[in-house]
Amino acid sequence: MTQITLLTPDDWHLHFRDGDMLQETVPATARLFQRAIVMPNLLPPVTDAKLASAYRERILAARPEGSSFEPLMTIFLTNDTSKQDIIDAKAAGVVAAKLYPAGATTNSDAAVKGLDALFPIFETMAEIGMLLLVHGEVTESHIDIFDREALFIERNLSRIVDAFPQLKVVFEHITTKEAAEFVTSASDNVAATITPQHLLLNRNDLLVGGVRPHNFCLPVLKRNIHQEALRAAVATGSSKFFLGTDSAPHEKHRKESACGCAGCYSAWSALELYAQVFDDLGVIEKLEGFASTHGPDFYGLPRNTGTVTLVKESWTVPSEIILPNGNPIVPFFAGEEVNWKVKS
C-alpha cells in the first residue's frame, strides 16, 4: 500500500507549555490533529476550572488563522483537590484529571504524595463521568528507574481499577510489557496511549554510542522486549490502545546539558512516524483505529468527520526549529528519514 486515508486523528496526550512557546506548539499539532488532550503540568499547575479555562483561551489564541483545532483540557490532581474542584471542572468542560506521582515528570513537584487520600476524588470522578489519566510510575529514589512502571501497576493502578470499576482510566504513555498486559486484561474502562518513541526506540537508542538527549523522555525508554510488546499490542488493532504522542518541547540547550530535560518534541512528525511503525508491522490498515477512532470512542466523544491522506514518500525531519524567542528546538527524529508523508 502506498497511500492511506484516515479520519482526521486526535492526539490524546501532549504538552503545549505556555507563553510564546504556544506560537510553535499549537500550530504544529493543529497541522494534522483535530483535538488534543492538553497536559496540566505548567508552573503553577492547572489545578482547577478557572486555570483550565484561562489556559484554554491562551491555546485558542495561538491557533493558526482559520483553524478549528480544539484543545481538550485537564486538571492536575494534588492532595488539596476537592470534590467541588472536580464538579466545577467538569461543568467548565474539562474532560479529565491527571494523576502524577510527585516528582515523576516535568513540573510535578506539586503532585500527589498519598494516593489513598484521593479515593474520594476518584469516586466523584466516576460518578460524574470525568476520566482519570495516569502517569504510572512510582517515584521512591531507591527504586530502579526501569522498574518504576511495573511497580506502579502492582502497588497503585490495580488498586484504583479494582476499587472504582466505573471510573474510566487511561494509562498514559505505557512503556512496558507489564503495562500492555495489564491494559489488555483489564475491563473495557481501562485503556492506554502509546508514544511514537516507545514504538520506534528502546534504551539502546538512548545509551549506545553516546547519550542521545533528544531520545530522553519519561517514562524512560525500556529494553527491546518491552518495545516489542508495545508493537505487538498496537498490531492487534485492540481498541484499548490509541495515539498519544506525549510531545514535550524543551529548548535545545535544556536538552543538551549536564542535567537535560525529559521529553521528545514529536508534533511535526508523529503521525508519519506512527504510519511507519504500522507499515513495518504489516498492519497499516489498523492505523486509523489507533489514530482516529479508538480515542474518541473511549472518551465518549464523536469521531472527526474530515480526513488526512498519507503517501509512502520519503522526507527528512528538520535538524532544528527556531522558536518564537529565537532559540532552537530539536524535534524528535531530527535529521532522520521518514517513509510516510502527509499529502498536501
Curated annotation (Swiss-Prot):
User: What's a single GO CC term here?
Assistant: cytosol
Which biological process annotations from GO are given for this protein? 'de novo' pyrimidine nucleobase biosynthetic process; 'de novo' UMP biosynthetic process
Q: Which reaction does it catalyse?
A: (S)-dihydroorotate + H2O = N-carbamoyl-L-aspartate + H(+)
Which residues are substrate-binding? H15, F16, R17, N41, H135, L218, H250, A262
Query: For binding Zn(2+) 1, which residues are annotated in this chain's numbering?
Result: H13, H15, K98, D246
N6-carboxylysine PTM positions read K98
InterPro entries documented for this protein: Amidohydro-rel, DHOdimr, Dihydroorotase_CS, Metal_Hydrolase
Cofactor details (free text):
Binds 2 Zn(2+) ions per subunit.
Q: Name the catalytic site residues.
A: D246
Query: Per its UniProt record, what CDD domains does this chain match?
Result: DHOase
Q: Name one Pfam family in it.
A: Amidohydro_1
Question: In which residues is Zn(2+) 2 bound?
Answer: K98, H135, H173
Assembly and interaction partners: Homodimer.
What is this protein's record name? Dihydroorotase
Gene name of the record: pyrC
